[in-house]
Amino acid sequence: MEIERSIAPITIEDLNELYTGSIARLIDYYHSGRGVKWKELYNIQKPLAAALCQGAAMHYHDKENGVKDFDVWFFYPFNQKHLPYRSIWNWDYTNPKFGRHPEFEGYSGRRVDVLVRSIKNYTHNDPVKTMHQFLQHENTSSARLLGKKAVVLLSPESSLGKVVCYKDSYFNP
């Protein structure tokens, strides 16, 4: 089914699949691809937090926005050098309930964009506070843009599905 925006609900199982597929994409790059140079500085398998962001996160919360694509962000503690913040990795989420976007050539499902950030201001073992610190206090276009839409935690597992931000409103679930 080709449709610009899927209105299918996003479930906890979908969030888990998005996390699993996205971390696998990063592991592929950072452990056996061109990103191997970061392996000594960053444990890609242990982010401070991972989150579904932007339009799909809005749809998870409000059930109205629809899903054009999925944006999954990983946040790591800064360690000597920043991770490549301009890189975007992609993979094909082929869950049939979401269909495919007609303009995304080469995808049989919805495109997933995977992004990473290394951040200096964070709170260990508190992903909600870490995300609030990033969204409210980092002076970056990424933080501002994410805060204007929505952020739903994917990791750590104990926080899966927690909405921490929706249209510049911050929640402490």
Segments the model singles out, each with a brief description of its role:
Residues 42, 77, 93-95, 138, ...:
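Short, isolated positions within intrinsically disordered regulatory regions of eukaryotic proteins
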Residues 42-46, 107, 159:
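Short, solvent-exposed loop/turn segments that connect beta-strands within catalytic domains
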Residues 78-90:
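Short, conserved charged micro-motifs
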Residues 31-70, 75-80:
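Active-site nucleotide-donor binding segment shared across nucleotidyl transfer reactions
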Residues 88-145, 151-153:
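Conserved catalytic core of two-metal-ion nucleotidyltransferases
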Residues 28, 39, 50-52, 71-74, ...:
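Generic low-polarity alpha-helical segments
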Residues 25-28, 43-51, 87-92:
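Short linear motifs at secondary-structure transitions and domain/linker junctions
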